[in-house]
Amino acid sequence: MRGAAPRVADLNLELNDLVLPINLLSEEVLQPSDDESEAPEEELFPFRIDTCCYRCEVNVRITLFAVEFGLRALEQLIVDGKLTFCCTTCARTLRNGR
């Protein structure tokens, strides 16, 4: 625009010269990558736990699916005594610490 007051006739609508066709830092071309689809997903393994209820000592069987790391972490919690299981009968009487 030129002049003290802007007018519609003074607007320059040709902006092609302002847009650069390439990146100034590099001329690399991004290849479409399918890394997400090519990366193998971790396999879920079925795992059965046979134990007893923490409160009434009745048999409890749990089947779960987890990745290998998840199974190892769960096993460590059980062995350390930081995780125990409860049967459905005892679970009905629990009130989440209330």
UniProtKB/Swiss-Prot annotation:
**What post-translational modification information does the record give?**
Highly phosphorylated.
Q: Which terms in the GO cellular component ontology are assigned?
A: host cell cytoplasm; host cell nucleus
Q: Where's it found, cell-wise?
A: Host cytoplasm; Host nucleus
* Domain of life of the native organism: Viruses
- Extract one GO molecular function annotation from the record: DNA-binding transcription factor activity
Q: Which GO terms describe its biological process?
A: DNA-templated transcription; symbiont-mediated perturbation of host cell cycle G1/S transition checkpoint; symbiont-mediated suppression of host innate immune response; symbiont-mediated suppression of host type I interferon-mediated signaling pathway
Query: InterPro entries in the record, alphabetically?
Result: Papilloma_E7
Q: Where is this region: E7 terminal domain?
A: 1-42
Q: Where are the transmembrane segments?
A: none
Q: Positions of the zinc fingers (unnamed)?
A: 53-90
State the span of motif (Nuclear export signal): 71-79
Q: Which family does it belong to?
A: Belongs to the papillomaviridae E7 protein family.
Q: How does it assemble?
A: Homodimer. Homooligomer. Interacts with host RB1; this interaction induces dissociation of RB1-E2F1 complex thereby disrupting RB1 activity. Interacts with host EP300; this interaction represses EP300 transcriptional activity. Interacts with protein E2; this interaction inhibits E7 oncogenic activity. Interacts with host TMEM173/STING; this interaction impairs the ability of TMEM173/STING to sense cytosolic DNA and promote the production of type I interferon (IFN-alpha and IFN-beta).
Q: What is known of its domains?
A: The E7 terminal domain is an intrinsically disordered domain, whose flexibility and conformational transitions confer target adaptability to the oncoprotein. It allows adaptation to a variety of protein targets and exposes the PEST degradation sequence that regulates its turnover in the cell.
Q: What does this protein do?
A: Plays a role in viral genome replication by driving entry of quiescent cells into the cell cycle. Stimulation of progression from G1 to S phase allows the virus to efficiently use the cellular DNA replicating machinery to achieve viral genome replication. E7 protein has both transforming and trans-activating activities. Induces the disassembly of the E2F1 transcription factor from RB1, with subsequent transcriptional activation of E2F1-regulated S-phase genes. Interferes with host histone deacetylation mediated by HDAC1 and HDAC2, leading to transcription activation.
Q: What is this protein called?
A: Protein E7
Annotated source species: Human papillomavirus 65
According to the entry, what is the taxonomic lineage of the organism? Viruses, Monodnaviria, Shotokuvirae, Cossaviricota, Papovaviricetes
